């Protein structure tokens, strides 16, 4: 996990300590829910509410993921490109905070894969779902 630029030992220790044994989660989606980062809609009847994160879950885990965003986006080119993609995409661009939540969820998926499957961090595999012209990681 230290191979990911912008992620330090304190972040890793907090991420591992807060949820406990990562292997008890069947998917990274469960960790996102555990952290309270899953989207919920506030709607009633014909009223269509806006989407937001639920905030039901581990507050400290959310805080750890939020605090790692500044150094991660400053030092890690791949995560910065994912963030920029979410903010500037033509169809459904996200606001800055929404993009940070999306990148946090991506980081959870990377952490989960490294810790449960025993794979190494691979920036090309991580970027495979983002298709953007002029990307520095063109496949």
Residue positions per predicted region:
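Phosphate-backbone recognition surface of nucleic-acid-processing proteins
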Residues: 2-5, 9-92, 96
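Low-complexity, acidic/Ser/Thr- and charged residue-rich accessory regions of DNA metabolism proteins
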Residues: 46-47, 83-139
């Amino acid at each position: 996990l230290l191979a990911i630029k912008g992620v330090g030992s304190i972040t890793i220790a907090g991420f591992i300590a807060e949820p406990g044994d990562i292997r008890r989660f069947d998917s990274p989606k469960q960790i996102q829910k555990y952290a309270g980062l899953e989207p919920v809609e506030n709607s009633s009847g014909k009223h269509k509410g806006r989407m937001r994160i639920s905030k039901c879950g581990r507050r400290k885990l959310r805080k750890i993921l939020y605090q790692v965003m500044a150094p991660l986006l400053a030092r890690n080119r791949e995560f910065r490109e994912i963030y920029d993609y979410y903010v500037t995409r033509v169809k459904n661009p996200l606001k800055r905070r929404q993009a940070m939540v999306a990148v946090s969820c991506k980081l959870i998926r990377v952490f989960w894969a490294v810790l449960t499957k025993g794979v190494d961090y691979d920036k090309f595999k991580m970027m495979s779902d983002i298709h953007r012209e002029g990307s520095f990681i063109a496949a």
